[in-house]
């Protein structure tokens, strides 16, 4: 179950991505490329996974709180779910483009 903190972080990340990508600015070339945006998103998911793994190892060693581990795992779950959703939308858009007549 998503907590308000996770939702707030997701909205903040989305706002940052939209701000950095230049959404709504037309076709200006000053924003990031789509490839670098995806690379950053995947890197963010990987970092979230690493933090989750580190928290799990720390809990197994008796050095971490269970709540911290649950929060880290939930954050990773949200990040992976978001990434999978974006992947599905990109594939769907690609398939729609391929169906267009030339």
From Swiss-Prot:
Keywords, sorted A to Z: Bacterial flagellum
InterPro entries: FliE (IPR001624)
The keyword Iron is annotated on this UniProt entry: no
GO biological process, one term: bacterial-type flagellum assembly
Pfam families: FliE
Domain of life where this protein originates: Bacteria
Predominant location category: other
Localization annotation: Bacterial flagellum basal body
An annotated Gene Ontology molecular function: cytoskeletal motor activity
Cellular component aspect of the GO annotation: bacterial-type flagellum basal body
UniProt record similarity statement: Belongs to the FliE family.
Protein name (Swiss-Prot/TrEMBL): Flagellar hook-basal body complex protein FliE 1
Native source organism of the sequence: Bradyrhizobium diazoefficiens (strain JCM 10833 / BCRC 13528 / IAM 13628 / NBRC 14792 / USDA 110)
Gene that this sequence comes from: fliE1
């Amino acid at each position: 179950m998503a907590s308000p903190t996770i939702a707030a972080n997701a909205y903040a990340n989305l706002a940052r991505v939209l701000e950095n990508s230049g959404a709504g600015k037309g076709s200006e070339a000053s924003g990031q490329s789509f490839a670098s945006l995806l690379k950053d998103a995947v890197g963010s998911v990987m970092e979230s996974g690493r933090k989750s793994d580190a928290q799990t190892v720390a809990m197994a060693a008796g050095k971490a709180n269970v709540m911290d581990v649950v929060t880290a795992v939930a954050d990773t779950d949200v990040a992976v779910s978001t990434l999978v959703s974006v992947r599905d939308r990109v594939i769907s858009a690609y398939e729609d483009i391929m169906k267009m007549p030339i």
